[in-house]
Amino acid sequence: AGDTVTKKKQALGLLLLAGLLWLGGTMPVQAQCVAKNEAFQSGEHVMYDLYFNWKFIWKKVGLASLTTNGTTYHSKPAYRFNLLSAGSKKTDFFFKMRDTLTCYVSDKLEPLYFRKAAEEGKRYTVDEAWFSYNDGVATVKQKRTWHNPVREPQEMEYSDSRCIFDMLSILAQARSYDPRDYKVGEKILFPMATGRRVEEQTLIYRGKEEIEANNDTIYRCLVFSFVEYKKGKEKEVITFFVSDDKNHLPIRLDMYLNFGSAKAFLKSVRGNRYPMTSVVEK
């Protein structure tokens, strides 16, 4: 049962990983975490519909919202990202999910702080990550606090010569990278803090495709695969479809799980920095 809860959490929460799509190059990202914001502005608000395949029938199971706001962090200019994903009252009967993720990055898009409060089934946990930089080395301190069931907190610290991201700061920085030089089959590698550990992540660029969202609009998208490797075999976990324009917004996600499939569709967006030039005229 615990494994099923974890998998369902990943199915509805993996929307966050959409930001992983835009790290450039096949080489690991260097420790330099500074970048110029070329993609978003304060006030951006994006909504998604979440679906799950239950016995060959697609059922709407919830919503997710992602907001971006200018703020300060330790008295310095910063951006704050909030992502809320919640199941509907109907699906609460089978599995209750309320996830709230908050991330702060500097005005130069350096990861600063990450927090995930997750109410999933009967479990309630809070994951936190604090980022620091010294002499070209990135360090992250992580802590998981268990509120239900009550357990001892789990803590860890990790340093890397590369930049370390969390699930939201990667979205903030990577959306500004230019993907025009990507080649089909190209692999993108980087470390990411998950709240309890730092894991190596792999994405593969698959090409372009036209995708219809839940706002009756078709978008020209770049397609990426998030993959895992087990015993030397490649397994596709998520397929991302991202707008082929300056906004680089996730339009659709397909998630392949041991117990079924899940999808997330763009429902609405406002406050985007650029026109959605990826829209395909019908």
Predicted segments, located by residue:
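N-terminal secretory signal peptides that target proteins for export/translocation
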Residues: 1-8
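Intrinsic-disorder-associated interaction segments
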Residues: 9, 16, 157-160
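Residue-level detector of intrinsically disordered/flexible regions characterized by low predicted structural confidence
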Residues: 9-11, 210
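Bacterial N-terminal signal peptides
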Residues: 13-24
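Sec/Tat signal peptide C-region and signal peptidase I cleavage site
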Residues: 26-31
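Acidic, serine/threonine-rich low-complexity disordered tracts
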Residues: 32-133, 176-282
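Active-site/ligand-binding surface loops and adjacent short beta/alpha elements
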Residues: 133-192
